[in-house]
Amino acid sequence: NFHIITMLRNLKVPHKSSEIFSVILPIFKVSMNLAHIKCLSMLLGALCAVQTVCLSKLAGAFDSKASRESCFRRIQRFMSQMVLDLDAVAGYLKSRIPSDGPYTLTMDRTNWKFGEVNINALVLGIAYDHMSFPILFRLLPKRGNSNCKERINIMQRFIRLFGRDSIKCLVADREFVGNEWFKWLNDNAIQYHIRIRDNFWVEDPRTNRNIRAQHIFANLKHGEERVLYRIYRICGELCYLSGAVIKDKTGKPEPQILVSFCRPEEALPAYKERWTIETMFKVLKSSGFNIEDTHMVHINRIEQLFGVVIIAYTWA
């Protein structure tokens, strides 16, 4: 992937901690002391240099004349004492986007496992220039899918920080469906384009007839698209439908069916932005920062580390 390769090349450019310090000082000076901000700036520079969360490797890349062992202990103390203001992190991340919006938001979830500990992150990003900036995230203390309350909470937090008018639309994959979720989006007039499973039941409110979504687009061939301007009822909510036939990961044709609050003609082009969040996950994980290397098991500390890695990701 061209965009992953470009980002990884940028990450390898050395970043002086003094330069990083001058940028992050105004953002964190209210919630962190100067010693912690300085340590954070050196940690960010080391992350960009070695692209791993392995503390011993980060200590070796610290912008400090102290010994590697001393730097290692300093990082350990910092990670145990640090309380990262995640609202401030979100404001900083948004400031890195050279656009005032409104934005296409991408919602997705990523997970990994260390020993018996399941680490499960719900992430809300802003799609811009073939990238997704991970503005907000929450580590879920469980395995499996997010629920409606967790999705609503992260959306409400975005609205509290940046306003509803900053949202152009939300795009998300098949996990992010449900009656209560669609109702909340509709009630708040948030434009969305969300993929549904092919076997979803769709009701035509004019006839009260139920039909599987895949049957509506059954005669489409690979590369063809269709936008339906009739309103349907899905998960109890009135929505629009659009569809296309794409190739899955194995190269086999499959339907891609989207449900929208309004403007269904924008659904298929907008949904292509969803792939930016998957690219971002690759950079955070095995293709870039190797966040899966963390040996932390306490969810609060992992959440803090996740925030630090996300800052380093956007610094590039």
Feature-to-residue mapping (PLM):
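Single, function-defining residue in the core of a domain
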Residues: 2-54, 64, 82, 89-90, ...
